[in-house]
Amino acid sequence: MFNTGTPDSENTYDAILVGAGIMSSTLAVLLHELEPDLRLLVVEKLSSAGLESSCAKNNAGTGHAANCELNYTPIQEDGHLSTTKAFEINKSFEQSLEFWASLAEKGKLIPKTFLNKLPHISLVFGDEDISLLKKRFSKLSSHAAFAKMEFTMDHGELQDWIPLIMDGRKQSEKIAATRIKRGTDIDFGNLTRSYINQIEGAKSIDINYSTNVENLQQDSEGDWYLSLEGAKKNRIVRSKFVFLGAGGGALSLLQKSRIPEGLLYAGFPVSGKWLICDEEKSTKTHNAKVYGKAAVGAPPMSVPHLDTRWIDKKKSLLFGPFAGFSSNFLKYGSKLDLFRSIKTTNLFSMLQAGLDNIDLGKYLLNQLIQTNEDRIDTLKRFLPQVSPNDWKLSTAGQRVQIIKQTSKGGVLKMGTEVVTSSDGSLAALLGASPGASTAVTIMIEVLNRCWQEKMKSSKWKNKMLELFPSIGTDINSDQEALLAIRKRNDFLLKLI
């Protein structure tokens, strides 16, 4: 604990957002749009915004809409193919597009600085997986959200879709793909910085870089006090609301907050690696995000994909991800992060989750002992004619997988989760994929849980309707509304 003192008005805020990544910056823009006079403080450990998980090379850059990700349509134990998650994620991503479209309409976002239209393709090999892909295509394409999905097994058509991947393949090879042309590649680092650029000139907003949150505590009246350590000065700040959006660093801060809800969580860090190609002969030929199928027994995070990426306006190809291990919770964190996060309240959950996920342990071990030749061999499944010297290994960001204590014990969770205090004064975002693609929906959830009275007010309701014309409409069941909002989004974001 620390001596809070009594911060003056200069150090008192309506909301403090920890981390200047895609999550906190999304929430900051939402709050500023809803009520411009709110005093906001954004605190970032690094020297600029969007340098950790939001940085383009630290994530897949996929606008996750379930167009091509087979793990979003899992096969159930009874053999049934579930589409629930696919429709949920598709709807969430459309809401992100809707928000960006509204900001673009106001002249506050320039789509071409972070957003590129790019086909999303699912690719499989062999009879069994082709049968699975056919089933997925049949179920999804019957709905308006995926009505423009195409399926083919024809080598000639595939040559047109993915020429680099088809180069050197035998005509007899059994291969199939689906394609949705309305896919995207997103530079979330540039988007984050665009958000921050929108708000940093406002008198009501302070942004502190190179500043670390050392501790936080709540007083008897519900106010939060944060101890900040900066490059030039240290200070204590106060707020009635705190959002912990510090990526992998959110867990340790959640634990320091001592809210009971935070005691249910632990985390396990997994680092990522990409093979990157900048050779123009390849980057000119391949123009898609192509997702394969995870190997039997491998976790969803291991789904291999070959992506066209635009990073700082430069076109590259990325293949992966390959997993590694570091005890850091952040790429620029500490090797002690994992060990410091182990508490008496979560140790049993971690041990139980480990025993229940032996396959994940085997997968990570196999990944750790891989050589670069092994990685190139994996790439050859996608690119039979690959030139190994054209591909370089690059370290991506850290993801911290959630381990949550439930009635069934410690459970490893693969998605993202919002944790809030019972009084709504603190919220934290934990987890990984689909993450950034659904940041807008996640932050609206934070607003609904932590700013309930404001969200019920006519002022905020009207403002939300202005930002999200489809709000209150289930676009998964209302085809007319879906098509209308897509037409608007495509026009304003230049995705036509």
Curated annotation (Swiss-Prot):
Keyword Phosphoprotein: no
SUPFAM superfamilies per UniProt: FAD/NAD(P)-binding domain
One of the GO BP terms on file: tricarboxylic acid cycle
Cofactor field: FAD
Record keywords, A-Z: FAD, Flavoprotein, Oxidoreductase, Tricarboxylic acid cycle
EC number: 1.1.5.4
Top EC group: oxidoreductase
Entry GO MF terms: 2-hydroxyglutarate dehydrogenase activity; L-malate dehydrogenase (quinone) activity
UniProt catalytic activity: (S)-malate + a quinone = a quinol + oxaloacetate
Listed pathway(s): Carbohydrate metabolism; tricarboxylic acid cycle; oxaloacetate from (S)-malate (quinone route): step 1/1
Family, as annotated: Belongs to the MQO family.
Name recorded for this polypeptide: Probable malate:quinone oxidoreductase
Species for this entry: Prochlorococcus marinus (strain NATL2A)
